[in-house]
Amino acid sequence: MRTYEIMYIVRPNIEEDAKKALVERFNGILASEGSEVLEEKDWGKRRLAYEINDFKEGFYNIVRIKTDNNKSTDEFQRLAKINDDIIRYIVIREDQDK
């Protein structure tokens, strides 16, 4: 099984309830595609290194998953691209020797 780390930034002007629903939805997408969510961290609101879509801050979320295939990461990326609430994301495959 491969381990991935997914970091995504949610727009700063989102309501708290909407942010919680968004995080639950994307964690559910990962789990429904056969991934095991190992860890989830909410880093809170942080200043961006540079402006993204006229935003200078964003809510950072990090999720570590373990999966047999790429279906969950592919689906996450597909939906994150079309969701206006997520302003940036990155999916990183962790080394096997950990």
From Swiss-Prot:
The keyword Ribonucleoprotein applies. GO terms for biological process: translation. Coiled coil: none annotated. InterPro entries: Ribosomal_bS6, Ribosomal_bS6_CS, Ribosomal_bS6_sf, Ribosomal_S6_plastid/chlpt, Transl_elong_EF1B/ribsomal_bS6. One of its GO terms (molecular function) is structural constituent of ribosome. Keywords: Ribonucleoprotein, Ribosomal protein, RNA-binding, rRNA-binding. Pfam families: Ribosomal_S6. One of its GO terms (cellular component) is ribonucleoprotein complex. Belongs to the bacterial ribosomal protein bS6 family. Binds together with bS18 to 16S ribosomal RNA. NCBIfam families: S6. This is Small ribosomal subunit protein bS6. It comes from Staphylococcus epidermidis (strain ATCC 35984 / DSM 28319 / BCRC 17069 / CCUG 31568 / BM 3577 / RP62A). The gene is rpsF.
